């Protein structure tokens, strides 16, 4: 299965992706991990990304797209993947379509993890990170909503909504049921 996971920070995408990766036997491709790997391995793309990060600038979409393209071209992603953190914009959605066209494949679905703002704030405050104040979290949620709203419209025919509240197990059960329905 080739899936994109969408949802606000704190929706549990990473947690669900790890479980789904195990159950479906496909890699969890997180853009955060891709950045860390490329920078850590001192690849050409990693060096380019690091130069922007060190200067306090956003890494250009082209660099992220190339990292994703490289990763999705690897053998373990041939039968599927779970994309987490990409795409974030309609422009990146178009880029992903181009990557997949080049690989002769397409997305099976976009999983949108729906969770209330209050639950996200509660979860993120519980993590106990110093930079996770309620104000910072609510700002991140607003940025997510503003950035991602057009993407939800872009993928409207592919979206499967998952209620991402309750236990990790309950959310995973709902996700697996939705994917089984997609497969039948």
From Swiss-Prot:
Pfam families: ADK. Residues 126-132 are annotated as: LID. Gene3D superfamilies: P-loop containing nucleotide triphosphate hydrolases. AMP binds at residues 31, 36, 57-59, 85-88, 92, 129, 140. GO terms for cellular component: cytoplasm. Its EC number is 2.7.4.3. CDD domains: ADK. GO terms for biological process: AMP salvage. One of its GO terms (molecular function) is adenylate kinase activity. It is an enzyme of class 2 (transferase). Pathway: Purine metabolism; AMP biosynthesis via salvage pathway; AMP from ADP: step 1/1. It is found in: Cytoplasm. SUPFAM superfamilies: P-loop containing nucleoside triphosphate hydrolases. Residues 30-59 are annotated as: NMP. Keywords: ATP-binding, Cytoplasm, Kinase, Nucleotide biosynthesis, Nucleotide-binding, Transferase. ATP binds at residues 10-15, 127, 166. Monomer. Belongs to the adenylate kinase family. Consists of three domains, a large central CORE domain and two small peripheral domains, NMPbind and LID, which undergo movements during catalysis. The LID domain closes over the site of phosphoryl transfer upon ATP binding. Assembling and dissambling the active center during each catalytic cycle provides an effective means to prevent ATP hydrolysis. HAMAP family: Adenylate_kinase_Adk. This is Adenylate kinase. It comes from Corynebacterium kroppenstedtii (strain DSM 44385 / JCM 11950 / CIP 105744 / CCUG 35717).
